[in-house]
Amino acid sequence: MHPESYSLAEVLAVADIHPFYNSEVQYPPQPDAIQHARESATKTATEVNLHTRPMVTKKDLYKVIKRLTHDTSPGNVYRLNSYISITGGGSGGLPLMFATDVKENRRHRSVFGDFMAACRLVDPGDWVLTTHASGYLYRSLDLTTELFENAGATVLSCGNYMTPAEVFQYLAHYHVNVLTGDGSQIIQLIHHISMLPVEQGQRLKLTKIIYTSEPLTQAQREHIIKTLGPIKIFSILGSAESGPYAIGSPDLTGQQECTSTVNFVFDTRTMLIEIFPSSIMEEPSPLSARPVPNGEPGIIVQTSLQRLRNPVVRYNTGDIGSVHALPERARDIIAQEDWEHLRVLRLHGRDRRFSFKWFAVYFEFENVATLMQAEGTGILQWQVILDTLKSSPQTTLEVRILRAIDREGLQSKEALVKKIRLFFNLLPENEHLFQITFVDDIGGFEKSGTGTKVMKFVDRTH
């Protein structure tokens, strides 16, 4: 496997003239400027030092992205020939967007498809059914369809609007052996299958589950195995900013006893990952911070070698993880020429001080607070609760609100509910997992251990 990618020197050279990283630059560079930067980087013999570069956060990036997205001047090439990925809702409720060059995006999909095949996530003859989302600006369906096709599979691109009963019929009728979707969609379908008569469930020939976007809990994994039998569970890791970049495979890293972490394999020829102490989340300018040794957990910082026109350099993801060597067991699968380039990223999850995840989307607490505290809402106190359904291990989201009595200038209750539902990206397939509860007094909220403080976020899933 010889993945196409840019050199670190090329990526840093373009970053120097890009407004993501240079506040004196108004617009991203034109194609000729990018080409000149690449040629200069290739000719320069000086050592490339990533450690002298400042880190950027999501807030840093999207402050610039917001300006570029709304600037329709002819000189703003950010809006030209771009593939748009969306990420968690902004404070106004509409999704944030990251633009990638269209040709870069296609090449990235091809390279990652080869990586999936090299890691045996996909085998010759696999038939894959995907239930990923499309529409409402989501591109998950076309992304995963192309990735699996590039990896050598035959794909049934079913999407998220088919009912579980319809998906089941397609799985059975076409002898599909691989099911892929967001974690929430997978669990929704597995729950449907678990309710069917045994003889109907036996029509399925599934050998693999490949989930994306959100980790499966231990209860969810057990539910899958109890329903489908001894099936392999794989995963794909990616983001709007970096695209897909790692795969989770028990064949490579072994079955995990601890489900509070998930092991992923990534290729250092396409993605550089540094791990920093958690203290960088609280430092205004963590330039002096140094990466922790391999094996120690900390904040994941990414530099993509597949993003050039809009580079991703030392991006603080807010995720917690650690980097490890591949275990020896992986030699049976990984080619010798690739071995030295692959690493294990052990993902511990999101830094829960700053965000939470529901139905494959991250929500920043800062943005939730801005929504709840906006003028005219009349919200005196609020709380977000993650839980699971009693009938299945699907994750639910409840928003509890204590509101001032109706007065002049307040939004109507209906308008407020509509605004909150828009913020949390409600779709037909997750509406039944969402609830807004208006409480009469402070007693309607979950309290801290001392019983005096209302907790803004309660997670009953862990």
Predicted regions and their residues:
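Active-site glycine/GP-rich loop and adjacent strand/helix microenvironment
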Residues: H2-I17, N160-H462
